[in-house]
Amino acid sequence: MAKKSKIAKYQKQLQLIEQYADLRRDLKAKGDYESLRKLPRDSNPNRLKNRDKIDGRPHAYMRKFGVSRINFRDLAHKGQLPGVTKASW
């Protein structure tokens, strides 16, 4: 489980990215890099680190499912991920 402050910071960063997305797109199209530089640093989507939707873990994130490898394994064993089966050969 990640610290609650890290999860809160992640949520705040998501809101900033959404808030400035249109303005950022327009400024990039114009080529106005000076105004882009004045936007908040965390409004840049490149700075976003993907986190597990369940417990906020930043490492071993599986993009297709939105969870870390640990939670993926638990959910797969419980049968809560549609289409995921245990491999056997």
From Swiss-Prot:
S-S bonds: none
Subunit note: Part of the 30S ribosomal subunit. Contacts proteins S3 and S10.
Pfam families referenced in this protein's UniProt entry, alphabetically: Ribosomal_S14
Species name: Streptococcus pyogenes serotype M1
Gene3D superfamilies per record: 30s Ribosomal Protein S14, Chain N
Protein function: Binds 16S rRNA, required for the assembly of 30S particles and may also be responsible for determining the conformation of the 16S rRNA at the A site.
Annotated region described as Disordered, given as residue ranges: 34-54
Recorded GO MF terms: rRNA binding; structural constituent of ribosome
Keywords carried by this UniProt record: Ribonucleoprotein, Ribosomal protein, RNA-binding, rRNA-binding
Gene Ontology cellular component list: cytoplasm; small ribosomal subunit
Chain ranges passing through the membrane: none
Protein name (database record): Small ribosomal subunit protein uS14A
PANTHER family: 30S RIBOSOMAL PROTEIN S14 (PTHR19836), SMALL RIBOSOMAL SUBUNIT PROTEIN US14M (PTHR19836:SF19)
InterPro entries: Ribosomal_uS14, Ribosomal_uS14_bac/plastid, Ribosomal_uS14_sf
Annotated family: Belongs to the universal ribosomal protein uS14 family.
Classification via SUPFAM superfamilies: Glucocorticoid receptor-like (DNA-binding domain) (SSF57716)
GO term, biological process aspect, one: translation
